[in-house]
Amino acid sequence: MSTKTSSEIIKDGLWHNNPALVQVLGLCPLLAVTSTVVNAIGLGLATLLVLMGSNLSVSLIRNFVSESVRLPAFVMIIASFVTCAELLMQAFTYELYQILGIFIPLIVTNCAILGRADAFASKNPPLPAILDGAMMGIGFLAVLMTLGAMRELIGQGTLFADMHLLLGPMAADWVIRPLEQYPDMLFMVLPPGAFVGLGLLIALKNGIDNHLKERRKAAEPAPASTGSKRVRVTGTIS
């Protein structure tokens, strides 16, 4: 059983062990879908739902599943929650579901979800397990949204375009255009732009971590001197 506190679980999911920036998992949907903010939010919310549900379920049955069928059982649980997320999107956000296409069912193959189920949920009680799933999901969603906003803004010159696909007619006029006349940059909308954007985000996180580490080192007090001195003795004693 893990001895992590709630604050450690939160920090790991959001920053220190972020599934996208540190573990670098789930790259296929992350790079393919994040051309706009609304696509990123749709996939991120579906992944968050699956992470929380699968972590909770795995934690509840952790004492009843033998080692030999552990992984197949986890995959079946994850697939069940992915099916639930897929049906919900078909019912309430069908147009967005059509845009995301195969990447919703492919959540089953996201190594981050199976990894959390095996490494954490199967060894911890339900409350820490669902908290871990929530924080990992929110951390993944935050990276998706940031990358989607970067690619949409640089690639198309807009933000929050097509939000009505997720939130209905009330969000139809939420689109932001910082520049009226903006030459579209197709490179950022295509997969190579996603690689560049993700690389910049990872570099930014590593730079922040290094800066904080240097600040902590500078703030540490210098070791206190004992006041004793060593005397070097040469020659022989007769």
From Swiss-Prot:
<feature type="transmembrane region" description="Helical">
    <location>
        <begin position="184"/>
        <end position="204"/>
    </location>
</feature>
<keyword id="KW-1133">Transmembrane helix</keyword>
<keyword id="KW-0813">Transport</keyword>
<feature type="transmembrane region" description="Helical">
    <location>
        <begin position="95"/>
        <end position="115"/>
    </location>
</feature>
<dbReference type="InterPro" id="IPR010968">
    <property type="entry name" value="RnfE"/>
</dbReference>
<feature type="transmembrane region" description="Helical">
    <location>
        <begin position="156"/>
        <end position="176"/>
    </location>
</feature>
<comment type="function">
    <text>Part of a membrane-bound complex that couples electron transfer with translocation of ions across the membrane.</text>
</comment>
<dbReference type="GO" id="GO:0005886">
    <property type="term" value="C:plasma membrane"/>
</dbReference>
<dbReference type="InterPro" id="IPR003667">
    <property type="entry name" value="NqrDE/RnfAE"/>
</dbReference>
<feature type="transmembrane region" description="Helical">
    <location>
        <begin position="30"/>
        <end position="50"/>
    </location>
</feature>
<keyword id="KW-0472">Membrane</keyword>
<protein>
    <recommendedName>
        <fullName>Ion-translocating oxidoreductase complex subunit E</fullName>
        <ecNumber>7.-.-.-</ecNumber>
    </recommendedName>
</protein>
<keyword id="KW-1003">Cell membrane</keyword>
<dbReference type="Pfam" id="PF02508">
    <property type="entry name" value="Rnf-Nqr"/>
</dbReference>
<keyword id="KW-0249">Electron transport</keyword>
<feature type="transmembrane region" description="Helical">
    <location>
        <begin position="127"/>
        <end position="147"/>
    </location>
</feature>
<comment type="similarity">
    <text>Belongs to the NqrDE/RnfAE family.</text>
</comment>
<comment type="subunit">
    <text>The complex is composed of six subunits: RnfA, RnfB, RnfC, RnfD, RnfE and RnfG.</text>
</comment>
<keyword id="KW-0997">Cell inner membrane</keyword>
<feature type="region of interest" description="Disordered">
    <location>
        <begin position="215"/>
        <end position="238"/>
    </location>
</feature>
<dbReference type="GO" id="GO:0022900">
    <property type="term" value="P:electron transport chain"/>
</dbReference>
<feature type="transmembrane region" description="Helical">
    <location>
        <begin position="72"/>
        <end position="92"/>
    </location>
</feature>
<keyword id="KW-0812">Transmembrane</keyword>
<keyword id="KW-1278">Translocase</keyword>
